[in-house]
Amino acid sequence: MAEKKMWGGRFRQATAALVEEYTQSVSFDRALYAQDIAGSKAHARMLAKQGVLTADEAARIVEGLDMVLAEIEGGTFVWRRELEDVHMNIESRLTELVGDVGKKLHTGRSRNDQVALDFRLFVSDRIRAWRGLARDLVAVLAERAGEHANTLLPGCTHMQPAQPVSLGHHLLAYAWMLRRDAERLADCDRRTRVCPLGAAALAGTTYPLDPAYVAEQLDMYGTFRNSMDAVSDRDFVLESLFCGATIMAHLSRLCEEIIIWANPAFGFVRLPDAYATGSSIMPQKKNPDVAEIMRGKTGRVYGALTAMLTTVKGLPMTYNRDMQEDKEPFLDCDRTVSASLEIMAGMLRELGFNEGRMRAALRAGFLNATELADYLVGKGIPFREAHHLTGAAVALAEERAITLEELPLADLQAICDRIGDDVYAVLDPAAAVARREMPGGTGPASVAAQLAELSGWLEE
């Protein structure tokens, strides 16, 4: 005879030990215990409301589930791999505690819609947590941006000096990226937190269930219109993993800049001791290991998304056991994204900015060349011609190893006789930044407007 499984009525042989270990998921899906119990309590109450269970039966089941929850959170619950997953472990212990009435809990329900519910709730809970952490990081970025609204540094394209910008404006670029990440998560949550109960295995059920009642009990946005869709798709996992991957892409870019700026060749930032490490052989080293590891972990999250896309790409309708492989990629992504957002916020709070080095760097790379071109346009010269004339001025300054503003007026007028001595005020980096007051620009008023808008969003 086969060992007693909850599904074992038609089996005569026991599951091979190696197969049991290979197919079990309780080693990782136990993370869903709170959602599984919450879903089962809502299901039991709904069964009583619909007359499938008596009120007393539902009450006993709910009480038993609360006892199971207490055991799990108290560390006394015994997880059994031979029971395969979190659902069977909880149901088995429930039946031990309340007797045969516990066996009625699964009425009108399959593990197919049960796991879909549990995982939707779990993913929703976690991406809501990510959203909170993303908002916290936006707040830190906005705070540091406000402190450095008037600190200037070279803005780059192609990793080459381009135009002067304020450090505040630079930091706010990341704040806006992360705000969009938070908004994406809120949008993803609306599609994730939808109740699949009532779908059963795939075709629905003959019991008079009320999925909308369960959805209301669990603070969900609604129910499914198609039972096969409800149990067969994991697009909510894909979408959440994409959101996580996008967050990590943004964090990785910020890490890259911190790493570069910490190099003495730049010297723009001073790493806090709490977010750096040393060398086992070189006593002078202060390495940006935290930023490097975060940059490296980005690939790990990308891998989770790729793994999940590959898992679901060729599945026939409806539920397939392949879907068990949706948990570990998300769980790993969750740990990585959550920790990375929190650590980045802490690192940025303590990161030191070397304003002197940033200011000195403004002298290299002719960052004010565009100002000269715009100045010439203001003198009535077409932009393309102004661009060409400015290029000639840059070439002359480069040949003499001086800056544009160090070129004598006579040399500038030899290039274009419309240049007057008012050009030197235009070439000042601070003036260049101050003139860019259009919405979204790097000017002080624009930065202040950005900060005000982000502050309002953070207070919502």
From Swiss-Prot:
Subcellular localization, as worded in the UniProt entry: Cytoplasm
Gene transcribed to yield this protein: argH
GO MF annotations in UniProt: argininosuccinate lyase activity
Name by which UniProt lists this protein: Argininosuccinate lyase
Highest taxon, organism lineage: Bacteria
Any one GO BP annotation for this protein: L-arginine biosynthetic process
Enzymatic class: lyase
Catalytic activity: 2-(N(omega)-L-arginino)succinate = fumarate + L-arginine
EC number(s) from the headed UniProt entry: 4.3.2.1
Gene3D superfamilies in UniProt: Fumarase/aspartase (C-terminal domain), Fumarase/aspartase (Central domain), Fumarase/aspartase (N-terminal domain)
PANTHER family from the UniProt entry: ARGININOSUCCINATE LYASE
A Pfam family of this chain: ASL_C2
Family the UniProt entry places it in: Belongs to the lyase 1 family. Argininosuccinate lyase subfamily.
Organism encoding this protein: Nitratidesulfovibrio vulgaris (strain DSM 19637 / Miyazaki F)
Main location: cytoplasm
Listed pathway(s): Amino-acid biosynthesis; L-arginine biosynthesis; L-arginine from L-ornithine and carbamoyl phosphate: step 3/3
Keyword line: Amino-acid biosynthesis, Arginine biosynthesis, Cytoplasm, Lyase
InterPro entries per record: Arg_succ_lyase_C, Argininosuccinate_lyase, Fumarase/histidase_N, Fumarate_lyase_CS, Fumarate_lyase_fam, Fumarate_lyase_N, L-Aspartase-like
Entry GO terms, CC: cytosol
Entry-linked CDD domains: Argininosuccinate_lyase (cd01359)
KW Lyase (keyword) present: yes
Lineage, highest ranks first: Bacteria, Pseudomonadati, Thermodesulfobacteriota, Desulfovibrionia, Desulfovibrionales
Entry annotated with the keyword Lyase: yes
